[in-house]
């Protein structure tokens, strides 16, 4: 489906329309005295190349070129328009920047000045607008795939046995038909225990796992845990005096802990970081050290038993804690987080190229937040809840918390809100600082969420599952 998005900018000048094609291959932009004087686009239509007309008037400054790779396409145009006063007042486009799906970004053509506008929503396949001897406005044709909305449902999972009880700032991971929980607090900044709890999905019963080997020496909060195969991997977290844990594995078949990296030998000790894994690597991103917030990404290969520090994201990705971190189709995604305030940007790391890309998303975007629940189903990243404003007492207080279930399609870069009218009673209460993992319950894959901090500053001890019916 191709949608014509109205032109943004001024309302004077001759109307022009290039139409819609299969994609945009080249962009030419010429600057003038006051802003963008000239644009021209080359398109691809099947096996044919279509060259659009020159829009505006080329000046002695010439034109700059932005080329799109054959296996890529433009998904985002950022521009600015402003009024220029002279013999007559006219509104012109002062700046244009183009970004592709794979992260290739043009330089900003022109001088950033005026009112910002954005053209996005899918694959951009054509342009239209108004011009005289300058460019007054720009719109686009955008192709959006007719993909079905992700469908699912929240259920509250029955719990029996000796469980973790109410807590937040802990983590969970699933191995087979068991969910494991480790760390956390009931009272702010006071870790509860260092038991490893195990929930049997067949009997819906909690118990404390027997533990041998190098049992972690600290009860901790702000800890992170992931699973690969039959093993759990636990990194970081702190106690009340801000001592930190190292990096451990737990063999769920032997109930045996192993210290893989002492705290002084691995990545910077931290808490409230983010962790995820693929088949061979554990990834650790960001978090809060004893002195500063971080934005480094470290990878531990479980075959080589070695840590590698990946490239550090550029300036567009700020230091942060409480971000979502997920692996989707081989790439590592950083979603939102807290850098002194809540942020709503998304970044993607490609391990094969050791390269970061800031991703521009659209749709029913959740507002800026951190310490939310997250999971991956297919190409979608699911999120629920989180903190949307820090408490004046920092971690001692609840902050302003949120609810809402959202999905980010990592191919179209579109957010959708999944909550349905009439099903509010089945949706978990608003919360943040909960533990979450991608899990499978009763044959469905989805988001498993346990505990968290309530708006009253109490702690939850409930277990919820958002099972996906279709994607």
Curated annotation (Swiss-Prot):
Disruption phenotype: No visible phenotype. Reduced simple nitrile levels in favor of isothiocyanates in tissues corresponding to its main basal expression. Abnormal accumulation of glucosinolate in seeds, during stratification and germination. It comes from Arabidopsis thaliana. Expressed only in seeds. Specifier protein responsible for constitutive and herbivore-induced simple nitrile formation, especially in seeds. Promotes simple nitriles, but not epithionitrile or thiocyanate formation. Converts allylglucosinolate (allyl-GSL), 2-propenylglucosinolate (sinigrin), indol-3-ylmethylglucosinolate (glucobrassicin), benzylisothiocyanate and benzylglucosinolate (glucotropaeolin) to their corresponding simple nitriles in the presence of myrosinase. Catalyzes mainly the conversion of benzylisothiocyanate when benzylglucosinolate is used as the initial substrate of myrosinase. Kelch repeats lie at residues 178-226, 231-277, 281-330, 332-379, 381-435, 446-471. This is Thiohydroximate-O-sulfate sulfur/sulfate-lyase (nitrile-forming) NSP2. Coiled coil: none annotated. A (Z)-N-(sulfonatooxy)alkanimidothioate binds at residues 238, 271, 293, 322, 371, 433. The proton donor differs depending on substrates. Gene3D superfamilies: Jacalin-like lectin domain, Kelch-type beta propeller. Its EC number is 4.8.1.5. Its cofactor is Fe(2+).
């Amino acid at each position: 489906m191709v949608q014509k998005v109205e032109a943004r900018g001024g309302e004077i000048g001759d109307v022009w329309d290039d139409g819609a094609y299969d994609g945009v291959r080249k962009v030419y932009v010429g600057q003038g005295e006051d802003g963008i004087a000239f644009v021209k686009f080359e398109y691809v239509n099947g096996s044919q190349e279509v060259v659009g007309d020159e829009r505006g008037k080329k000046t002695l400054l010439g034109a700059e070129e932005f080329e799109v790779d054959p296996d890529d396409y433009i998904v985002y145009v950022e521009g600015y328009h402003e009024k220029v006063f002279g013999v007559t007042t006219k509104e012109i486009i002062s700046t244009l920047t183009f970004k592709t799906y794979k992260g290739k970004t043009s330089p900003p053509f022109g001088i950033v000045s005026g009112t910002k506008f954005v053209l996005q929503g899918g694959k951009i396949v054509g342009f239209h607008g108004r011009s005289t001897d300058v460019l007054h406005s720009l719109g686009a044709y955008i192709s959006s795939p007719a993909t079905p909305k992700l469908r699912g449902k929240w259920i509250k999972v029955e719990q029996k046995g000796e469980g973790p009880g109410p807590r937040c700032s802990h983590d969970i991971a699933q191995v087979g038909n068991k969910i494991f929980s480790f760390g956390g607090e009931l009272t702010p900044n006071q870790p509860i225990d260092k038991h490893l709890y195990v929930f049997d999905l067949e009997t819906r019963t909690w118990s404390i796992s027997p533990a041998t080997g190098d049992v972690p020496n600290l009860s901790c909060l702000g800890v992170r845990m992931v699973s690969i195969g039959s093993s759990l991997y636990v990194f970081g977290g702190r106690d009340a005096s801000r001592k930190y844990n190292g990096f451990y594995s737990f063999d769920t078949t032997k109930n045996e802990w192993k210290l893989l990296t002492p705290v002084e030998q691995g990545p910077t000790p931290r808490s409230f970081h983010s962790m995820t894994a693929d088949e061979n690597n554990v990834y650790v991103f960001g978090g809060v050290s004893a002195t500063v917030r971080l934005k480094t990404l470290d990878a531990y290969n479980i075959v080589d038993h070695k840590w590698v520090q990946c490239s550090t994201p550029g300036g567009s990705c700020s230091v942060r804690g409480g971000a979502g971190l997920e692996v989707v189709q081989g790439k590592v995604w950083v979603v939102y987080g807290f850098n002194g305030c809540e942020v709503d940007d998304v970044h993607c790391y490609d391990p094969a190229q050791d390269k970061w890309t800031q991703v521009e998303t659209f749709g029913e975007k959740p507002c800026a937040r951190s310490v939310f629940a997250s999971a991956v189903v297919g190409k979608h990243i699911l999120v629920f809840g989180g903190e949307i404003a820090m408490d004046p007492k920092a971690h001692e207080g609840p902050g302003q918390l949120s609810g809402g279930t959202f999905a980010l399609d990592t191919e179209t870069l579109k957010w959708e809100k999944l909550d349905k009218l009439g099903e509010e009673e089945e949706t978990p209460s608003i919360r943040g600082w909960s533990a979450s993992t991608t899990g499978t319950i009763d044959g469905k894959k989805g988001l498993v969420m346990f505990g968290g901090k309530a708006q009253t500053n109490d702690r939850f001890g409930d277990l919820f599952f958002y099972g996906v019916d279709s994607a």
